[in-house]
């Protein structure tokens, strides 16, 4: 009895009996962006902390399907609706945000300024509309979280954290292109005459803070843009240099609710290649960036099983697929890729990270956001092949797949990246660091709520 009482007095965090943290996670209304938050959210929950996820209503079902508590904020705006408004064509704004270029050769101030303008007007402001930010600030002031974790597009998160005094950190789902581009822009701006200096992102944040009776010094604005620290699951050698504290952790895949098909439980009789253009790309843009039926025909004579993720609409327009192609609407990547020898994909975060975690050579056909950069990084590391969409044809893809299956050096390089990811702490191992950093950065206002 005495031992039981002693254990109870210790509480969830050892002899000090510290109360659990309140942790608020937030994400734009896009499934794959949210999926990358789930393992960290559950690690915190399993450690005894209170966890809630705030997002626009379009994401509510996805959040609750992951077993976490959803708090709808804002209207029903979503990434899909925004893309529909611009005509379903990512080209106009993608050309202003070429991160493969940003992270390579030095840029002009004009290019960097244009990039910051495009990001604030076409990404940050639409994804963080006034109603979403208003509801987030009200939630933070009411619930008083100790820590706010936010994915890199969701600036409603740090704004809400600033409003209630919570600590806050970004949780990345890919290379830190936003903060890398920001650092380049600030260096270039510092060399300009005062009258030429503009900062669209800081201006937008400043207006938003003023609406809620908040002010912030320049240093605080930069902290809101980049987080008080950054959680980064990228393999160490692929990690971009960025200002501020970076806390690495191991990527753990989460693909939503799924059921394994019987065929996936059996060992393949020949090399298996995953061919996926990504569910998120199909859902977001309503079309494919590459002529998949021609590409599959070009792989038809390989002594390999090609598992292609195609929805019913794609299948109906593809005609008869080659005999070595297994066409499926959806299969969880965390279950499929461990059985594969190579993967062809669009550069999406979940697929790319899961492939890297499994040590697979990757053929990346990428056009959007940071995907061209990821393809270039993998090619430079010797762990993959990068193909620009405009240069893609059946012969080029076939050559890339053959190389991925036969090149032992590529397989070894992919294995090195896998080892880098496995060397980092799991989300469960990350929790003590989050507890320490939260105590360090929380300014006290988050503790001013009534007794729980």
UniProtKB/Swiss-Prot annotation:
Domain of life of the organism in this record? Bacteria
Query: What catalytic activity does the UniProt entry give for this protein?
Result: tylactone + dTDP-alpha-D-mycaminose = 5-O-beta-D-mycaminosyltylactone + dTDP + H(+)
The activity regulation comment is: The activity of TylM2 is substantially increased by the addition of the accessory protein TylM3.
Q: In which pathway does it act?
A: Antibiotic biosynthesis; tylosin biosynthesis
SUPFAM superfamilies on file: UDP-Glycosyltransferase/glycogen phosphorylase
One Pfam family hit: EryCIII-like_C
Name the residue ranges with Basic and acidic residues bias.
1-16
Molecular function GO terms recorded? hexosyltransferase activity; UDP-glycosyltransferase activity
Keywords tagged on the record: Antibiotic biosynthesis, Glycosyltransferase, Transferase
- Summarize the protein's role: Involved in the biosynthesis of the macrolide antibiotic tylosin derived from the polyketide lactone tylactone. Catalyzes the transfer of alpha-D-mycaminosyl from dTDP-alpha-D-mycaminose to the 5-hydroxyl group of tylactone to yield 5-O-mycaminosytylactone. It can also accept 16-membered tylactone and 12-membered ring macrolide.
Hey, which family's this protein in? Belongs to the glycosyltransferase 28 family.
Protein name per its UniProtKB record: Tylactone mycaminosyltransferase
Question: Species name for this entry?
Answer: Streptomyces fradiae (Streptomyces roseoflavus)
Q: What is the lineage of its organism?
A: Bacteria, Bacillati, Actinomycetota, Actinomycetes, Kitasatosporales
